[in-house]
Amino acid sequence: MSYSRSVYSSSSVVGGSPYRSLSSAPRFIPSSSAASVHAGAGGSGARISVSRVSSVGSGFGGGYSGVSNVNLIGGGQNEKETMQDLNDRLASYLERVRSLEAANKKLEVQIRQHTEKKGPSKDWSPYYKTIEDLRKQVFDSTLENSQLVLQIDNARLAADDFRVKYEAEMAIRMSVEGDITGLRKLIDDTNVSRMNLENEIESLKEELIFLKKNHQDDVTELQAQVARSAVTVEVDAPKSQDLGKIMTELRAQYDGLAQKNRDDVEKWYQSKVDEHTVQVNLDTEALHSAKSSVTDLRRTVQSLEIELESLRNQKASLEGTLHDTEARYAMELEMLGGTAMAMEAELVQVRSDCQRQQQEYQALLNTKMKLEAEIHTYRRLLEGDGSFDLQDAVPTVTTQTVKKVITTTQRIVDGKVVSESNDTEVLKS
């Protein structure tokens, strides 16, 4: 951002005599031009044309060229005619003076009205309400912006909390899934062990059946042998043991042993089955609990994802609202800056108009004073003052230099003119 100032100055010379220089001539030739006043609508842009009156006296013996005192009292027909002509011209001149005074008064009224309407005023009370409204708008905008920033911060913190919770729940979910994978592997191992035990039981059953069949074959064979060898031999030896009884006892022993083995096998099998059944039940319960936990965790994750998505949407909407608000207030600030620049330009224009009107008023006042001095001179001529000096008739030539300095201030941002203001200063010398 840079500032550039350019100063333009112009000078003009205001003053000088509104009369032509007096010189000796054969006749008294006054020349005059009536003043005219032209004003635009609203009293602005007034243009004033001041009459210039010059008179060249003759018939006074060429006294205006080098004589300081002129005696107007003398005899002769030429002097009477000259005085009569002078009186007539003075009457017309006084009439013009009255018209100029009336025009001057009218112009003063217009200047006063214009000054009251558009002139600089020290009463800034009408602008206080606008300033207070603008301050209130700026304060409300700042407060709303702070609230939006606070809401965004709260939403960001809530999103961070939900992200942390989501990561924690995700870690728990991963650990539970790992436990479930381990339990599934354990269930597979248990199923393999159960199948092996079932196969072993089947093999033991087949072996038991084979043993029973062999035992039955042995018993049958022994019975057949006993039946075939039924020979009665009587000796004096002591009475032999009863083979049937012995076989019965053997059969009973074998049956008891087989039954014992069968009972042992059944007990062992039943214990193994019960043990594996308990383990399977425990594994099944753990699997059901893990499945329910996984289902709950999935529902929790879904709800957290939905809530996170809603928070993201809310954050996006808040950011969009913030951008829209910033853009709107930037436009409003730009409009207010343009209004302030326009008011500054209008103030500069009003000051320039006031200075110009003051200069015009001063010029009119100088003209009026010169006209009054000329009227006073004519009155002295009419009264026949013998001590009339030519320098009294010739108005004093005053030269006034008016220097106008125009200062232009431009505010440049990135090579573009953002604001521009003009300040006009009038210097008199």
Curated annotation (Swiss-Prot):
The keyword Signal does not apply. Disulfide bonds: none annotated. Residues 2-78 are annotated as: Head. Residues 247-385 are annotated as: Coil 2. The record marks D236, A237 as: Cleavage. The keyword Transmembrane helix does not apply. The record marks Y329 as: Stutter. GO terms for molecular function: structural molecule activity. Residues 131-222 are annotated as: Coil 1B. Residues 115-130 are annotated as: Linker 1. Residues 386-429 are annotated as: Tail. Residues 79-114 are annotated as: Coil 1A. Phosphorylated. Belongs to the intermediate filament family. There are two types of cytoskeletal and microfibrillar keratin: I (acidic; 40-55 kDa) and II (neutral to basic; 56-70 kDa). This is Keratin, type I cytoskeletal 18. The lineage of its organism: Eukaryota, Metazoa, Chordata, Craniata, Vertebrata. The gene is krt18.
